[in-house]
Amino acid sequence: MGEMGKAMGLLISGTLVYYHCAYRNATLLSLFSDVFIVLLCSLAILGLLFRQLNVSVPVDPLEWQISQDTASNIVARLANTVGAAEGVLRVAATGHDKRLFVKVVICLYFLSALGRLISGVTVAYAGLCLFCLSMLCQTSQSLGNCVLKRGNGQILEQEAHSDT
């Protein structure tokens, strides 16, 4: 799936989560429960249908496992992110870097004020929208550069043929 497909899928999923949590005033736990109930019922109906049609579906549990390297990579990335955030906060708290301290304090005050004005779900959804927008812009820029290169190549080829 391309970057644009990932961004659109993420945006659609985020919109559904935002609707469920913000407008229905439901919790995230309620959303996960609803999703698992729908998946369980759908799988049960498909199982009954396949049994009725005498279709055998092989279930290989090894296909659903991730490798140990993948699991280690996920944990290492999470640990690096938490470690980097902890390092920034430690340097800011000691006061060795005054500019970093001021930036952290301003960001924390801004987030505190934002949290009092609007709900956390709205902030998370706005962040998701901005993230998807940046993914779409990066994809469109790379497509634009590709088109420009092709266009310039065709123009250069036409000029070369017209000179001869």
UniProtKB/Swiss-Prot annotation:
Cell compartment(s), UniProt: Endoplasmic reticulum membrane
UniProt keyword Cytoplasm, yes or no: no
GO cellular component terms given for this protein: endoplasmic reticulum membrane
Reticulon domain: residues covered: 1-164
Membrane topology per record: Multi-pass membrane protein
Keywords, sorted A to Z: Endoplasmic reticulum, Membrane, Transmembrane, Transmembrane helix
Superkingdom classification of source: Eukaryota
Bilayer-crossing regions: 30-50, 117-137
Pfam families the record matches: Reticulon
PANTHER family, sorted: RETICULON-LIKE PROTEIN B22 (PTHR47879:SF2)
Listed name of the protein: Reticulon-like protein B22
Taxonomy of the source species: Eukaryota, Viridiplantae, Streptophyta, Embryophyta, Tracheophyta
Gene that encodes it: RTNLB22
